[in-house]
């Protein structure tokens, strides 16, 4: 078991979550996209906000897809002054 898998299992156990609900690949891809497309400090905040949205009923693939698209276009938006 990798360190990431051990950490995830431990965090899930401590928070009373099902480890199978932790879609590591989606979350890691999302935070990578935000870190590179927006700013590194934006990645953990974005992960938290996506988690809040998922907790309120939005599906993770939908939330991650929307935010990844937003991050991909962020450079263009910030250049336009949006």
Segments from the language model and where they lie:
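An acidic intrinsically disordered interaction segment
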Residues: 1-25, 81
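C-terminal binding/interaction regions
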Residues: 9-12, 58-82
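A structural signal for alpha-helix termini and helix-coil/disorder junctions
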Residues: 17, 40, 73-77
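Amphipathic, hydrophobic secondary-structure cores in small proteins
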Residues: 19-56, 61
């Amino acid at each position: 078991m990798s360190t990431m898998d051990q950490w995830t299992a431990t965090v899930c156990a401590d928070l009373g979550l099902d480890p199978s609900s932790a879609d590591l690949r989606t979350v890691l891809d999302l935070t990578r996209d935000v870190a590179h497309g927006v700013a590194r400090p934006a990645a953990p905040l974005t992960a938290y906000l996506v988690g809040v949205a998922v907790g309120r009923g939005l599906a993770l693939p939908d939330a991650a897809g929307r935010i990844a698209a937003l991050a991909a276009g962020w450079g263009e938006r910030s250049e336009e002054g949006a």
